Design a protein with these regions (language model features):
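Glycine-rich, histidine-containing beta strand-loop boundary motifs that form or position
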Residues: 64, 105, 118-121
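Acidic side chains
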Residues: 54, 68, 96, 103-104, ...
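Charge-dense polyanion-binding interfaces
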Residues: 84-95, 99, 185-193
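Short, charge-rich binding segments
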Residues: 83-85, 94-100, 105-111, 149-150
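Conserved, structured C-terminal
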Residues: 1-25, 34, 111-449
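Acidic, proline/glycine-enriched N-terminal capping motif
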Residues: 1-91, 100, 335
């Protein structure tokens, strides 16, 4: 084992909890303009008309090409791959040998022997590691996110989201386009360039008819495609969205995208840790919040905890299959939305600014996540029953809320819980001195906007 690996770094620092709690980094970065108009109107646009986000910078894109592409993906993904191929897409789920979630990413079927994984670096790196070390006849093609890539990206990505998304694309195209099924990929021309588009949604209910299209193509075509979309969108009141609004989209859709990945411990992931560099994403990631446990494994989740049961298919062999089969009929935690009490939120906002010696942890508006992995304790009757993850405000919900994972008995509409806001002790310069406080919250098992 060399010294320049994640595994070596963990040994030097004294384990994953110490490393993550001391890391100075904040929330996952979106290197784009903060606002184009203002984040409130930008949030409202994805419900009332449409919004266009430029996703060309913040996500890692790793491609796989060759005769073993399908075999590689099937060996690592919990999803079924029986019908996967060209112009198909999936929310790819990867687990360790104990059935604990490593992460998810969007899998694009570009050709029958070519696919790409797009998202935060964890899952693309996990699959690339196996492609390079597992004896697969696969070429790995990396297009790093902008923070790790001083050059130009290979592709542009534009997310067009909202009820007028299809009308805007058709106006830009100059006529009707063929219907693209949910989580399928279609193509058409814009500004004389071939554009491919995935039908999925970042807000609202997944499966809505073409209310969300992720358009992508060669980077050199991006400016012309963007111009024609902006021109077409004027008639419909479309807005461009900035990083502030973008950070809140998952709150409405319910995508809990950044739990601690189950890669920091265990023999089944040791090779991966020894393959990763000591200065990469998982080495620099940070952990914050009031949820405090003795072992990093207490922060891990399973696909069942996040509602991904329908993405776990036992029609093929994959890493974690045996564990997930054994776990499937047990009681699991559940993902829920927590609507924070308006009075308590108002008190928090004031306390973070005017609290003096009793200052509370600053509640950044509209998105108050201050680490890569945000874990705040959820209590019921004084006992810890789960953790709150992403938290923030959207005008569409009309209040402050968070995504959470709680014990099943508390995952019922109207259940009352409290969220502990603030950390038990400052460990990072980026977190100000403050006192912890409790916020009342109400459980909802369905989206709040």
């Amino acid at each position: 084992m060399t010294n320049n690996t994640l595994e070596a770094r963990l040994h030097r620092i004294g384990g994953p909890l110490r490393m993550l709690r001391a890391a100075p980094g904040g929330a996952y970065p979106f290197p784009m303009r903060a606002e184009f108009t203002n984040w409130r109107d930008e949030q409202e646009a994805w419900k009332s008309t449409a919004i266009l986000f430029d996703q060309s910078f913040h996500m890692t894109d790793v491609g796989f090409r060759g005769p073993d592409t399908g075999r590689l993906l099937s060996a690592l993904g919990t999803n079924s791959f029986r019908t996967f191929g060209r112009n198909k897409a999936k929310q790819f789920i990867a687990c360790d040998a104990q059935g604990r979630l490593i992460g998810d990413a969007i899998l694009f079927g570009l050709e029958d022997d070519r696919a790409s994984l797009v998202g935060s670096p964890t899952v693309p790196d996990w699959v690339a590691y196996h492609a390079e070390t597992g004896g697969y006849d696969v070429e790995v093609i990396r297009d790093e996110r902008s923070l790790a890539n001083p050059g130009r990206r290979a592709l542009y990505r534009y997310q067009l989201q909202g009820p007028r998304a299809q009308a805007i694309v058709e106006k830009a195209h100059g006529g009707p386009i063929d219907r693209i099924k949910f989580f399928a990929i279609g193509d058409f021309t814009l500004a004389g360039h071939r554009v491919r588009a995935l039908n999925h949604t970042m807000t609202g209910a997944p499966g809505d008819e073409m209310t969300g299209l992720e358009l992508f193509g060669p980077a050199e075509d991006g400016p012309a495609v963007l111009d024609v979309l902006l021109a077409a969108g004027e008639e419909f009141g479309m807005r461009q969205g900035g990083a502030i609004a973008y950070s809140t989209t998952a709150l409405e859709s319910g995508w809990l995208g950044l739990p601690v990945p189950a890669v920091y411990t265990g023999e089944s992931t040791r090779g991966f840790r020894e393959w990763l560099g000591a200065d990469g994403y998982l080495s620099a990631a940070s952990l914050a919040g009031s949820y405090s446990a003795e072992h990093i494994e207490d922060y891990y989740v399973t696909p069942y905890d996040l509602g991904y049961r329908n993405m776990v298919r036992f029609d093929h062999d994959f890493i974690g299959r045996q564990a997930l089969e054994e776990l499937q009929d047990r009681t699991h935690r559940r993902k829920v939305w927590l609507r924070w009490n308006d009075e308590d939120v108002t008190r928090l906002l004031a306390g973070g600014l005017f609290g003096g010696e009793l200052r509370t942890k600053y509640l950044a508006v509209p998105y108050a996540v201050y680490a890569t992995f945000q874990y705040d304790a959820v209590l019921a009757g004084g006992a810890q029953v789960g953790f709150s993850n992403r938290t923030g405000y959207t005008v569409n919900a009309g209040g402050w809320f968070s995504l959470a994972v709680v014990d099943e008995e508390h995952a019922r509409d109207g259940a009352e819980v409290t969220v502990v806001w603030g950390e038990p002790g400052g460990t990072r310069d980026g977190v100000e001195r403050h006192v912890q406080t409790e916020v009342r919250a109400t459980v909802s098992t369905s989206p709040l906007a």
